[in-house]
Amino acid sequence: MHAASREAFERLIKTLDQGLKESDNAVGNGATTGTELFDVVDVLDQERSLRVAMVDAAATPEQRVELVKTLLSGKVTASTEEIVSAAVSQNWSNSQDFRTGLERLGRRALLRSAEAQGQLERVEEELFSLARILERESELELLLSDRAAAVDDRRDLLAKVLYGKVSSVTEALALQAVGRARKAPVDLLDDLCQEAASLNGYEVARVTSAGPLSEEQKASLSEKLHKIYGRKIAVHTEVDSSLLGGAVVRVGDEVIDGSTAGKLERMRRSLA
């Protein structure tokens, strides 16, 4: 996002969070608002002229709010309409930033719903696990990323895969990740995992080890990474026996390769 859009988005985050905090049903309102914001984004993806009209600098904020009322009144809850109205009242750098802002607000609303249920950590873990499954199941990822197929068909496919296996919030977040052209579903799921961790005050560490790590080992690693990075780290693990031993740790764009395979490769290069 550009500077003006970032400022607008930060103000909207405060509006959304405050509204859910004051709600007597943060779980239900968060889930409904998030889902409805995704529906609005789907419409904006199909109607570029509408997206442009909602951030038209030639129109007054009041005129843009009136457009929102005309389109959404009676079709979404009052809280969703209020968020979209607040969004069009802001100054955005471009219409794409506006659309992205609404999508991110939808994600945050759903994560706040999970937080209110005490399920935020579970959602974080499920998102990480789902991303790893898609990495392993390349055929499934290709089907979900196939732009020649209708978005609804791809989402139906993923819904069948997820049915009864994850929380409702995880399912809603995962389904909205399908059909977003700018990123592959795996990358969006990793972004969502990090967003969930951030709400808990953590950053995600992706740890690939030659064998399963015990809870004690994960806790010890989390503490060591905390000392290195100066912030709390949520450790998510996966097993890759080809590493032979040790582990590879990824935090953001940084990689710490302490695997046996990595050490052997570095030794081979030094001798070449």
From Swiss-Prot:
Localization: Cell membrane
Example GO molecular function: proton-transporting ATP synthase activity, rotational mechanism
Source organism superkingdom: Bacteria
UniProt xrefs under InterPro entries: ATP_synth_OSCP/delta_N_sf (IPR026015), ATPase_OSCP/d_CS (IPR020781), ATPase_OSCP/dsu (IPR000711)
Bilayer topology term: Peripheral membrane protein
Keywords: ATP synthesis, Cell membrane, CF(1), Hydrogen ion transport, Ion transport, Membrane, Transport
Residue stretches in coiled coil: none
Gene3D superfamilies: N-terminal domain of the delta subunit of the F1F0-ATP synthase
Gene Ontology cellular-component terms listed: plasma membrane; proton-transporting ATP synthase complex
HAMAP family the record matches: ATP_synth_delta_bact
UniProt function note: F(1)F(0) ATP synthase produces ATP from ADP in the presence of a proton or sodium gradient. F-type ATPases consist of two structural domains, F(1) containing the extramembraneous catalytic core and F(0) containing the membrane proton channel, linked together by a central stalk and a peripheral stalk. During catalysis, ATP synthesis in the catalytic domain of F(1) is coupled via a rotary mechanism of the central stalk subunits to proton translocation. This protein is part of the stalk that links CF(0) to CF(1). It either transmits conformational changes from CF(0) to CF(1) or is implicated in proton conduction.
Family: Belongs to the ATPase delta chain family.
Complex formation: F-type ATPases have 2 components, F(1) - the catalytic core - and F(0) - the membrane proton channel. F(1) has five subunits: alpha(3), beta(3), gamma(1), delta(1), epsilon(1). F(0) has three main subunits: a(1), b(2) and c(10-14). The alpha and beta chains form an alternating ring which encloses part of the gamma chain. F(1) is attached to F(0) by a central stalk formed by the gamma and epsilon chains, while a peripheral stalk is formed by the delta and b chains.
Protein known as: ATP synthase subunit delta
